[in-house]
Amino acid sequence: MSPKLTEDKNKRKGKNKTILFLYIAVLLFIIWAIATIWLAMTYKLNNKNNEENEVINSAFNKKNPTINFNSEEDKIFENTDRDDLKPPMETVLKDRTLRLKNIKGIFGNMKSPKEISAFHSTFGKEVVYIYHSHSRESFLPYLKDTSRPEEAYHSVANITLVGKMLGRAMDQRGVGTKVETVDIVHLLNSRKLAYTSSYNVSRELVQLSQNENKDLEYFIDIHRDSLRKENTTTEINRTKYASLLFVVGTGHAEYEKNLQFANNLHTLLENRYPALSKGILKKSSSQGNGIYNQDISPNSLIIEIGGVDNTVEELHRSTEALAEVLSDYYWEENSESR
């Protein structure tokens, strides 16, 4: 091969190498540019999310300034400013016009959304006692002439209808349950007592039932919250439920046993119905009654089901969920007697 041809061939090889290097350089530049843009966008997005979280947290803190968590877990907390409502008796005694005439029938006809098969039974024994220290706590959707939480009281459309729903759901699961429907407000009025004596009067009923029936093991005082709907409603699988809140009084020596009972139920609810339970509220004697008849039994609790704005459908779903958990807990604790 002539020297000239060899020289031309070498030149072409050199030129091809140069073009290849240029292609590689351009490709590396494009990759670098894409990576830089991606990192910049990611950084910007993270900053935006952090700012949004700060705004949300700030808004939550402003909206709920009284909640002070006092344990390693957020489920148990104290609320130092949330005293028991102390409405005047004339407010509680006033019967407002109902939006629906057959309110008892509406609550009473709510059916379980699924077929319940009771694998166990207490065989006629009543082992759960449900009562209502604030028996006239009502729900604004069913009261015609008010939208104020402090006026949500009624002699018929009240929390006792929710207690009955819970009692029926417990019975369906084989756990014999007595639902106390005595109107505490009527007893207070007949004795000329203030609303603050509600727990003293309901205590008499609890002790009377306890003396008459030695089989009673669980004592559940059902209430509704006075907070508005955004604080008493949760959504599970796109379905709205009335939130649950356990209240434990710390004004007696053995309250930690009640706290453990509440914690057990809360944990079971979290496993099956996440976020249905808002947690456990500890209340001392400086914040209200402080005992709430819970010194009678370690299995005694206040359970708030929903609030002033919740509907019968939301309340019913929550009583079904609570009955499922409470009945399973009962059978687990009494497994030897099955």
For each predicted feature, which ranges?
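Solvent-exposed loop/turn segments at secondary-structure junctions
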Residues: S135-S138, D183-L187, R224-K229, G251-E254, ...
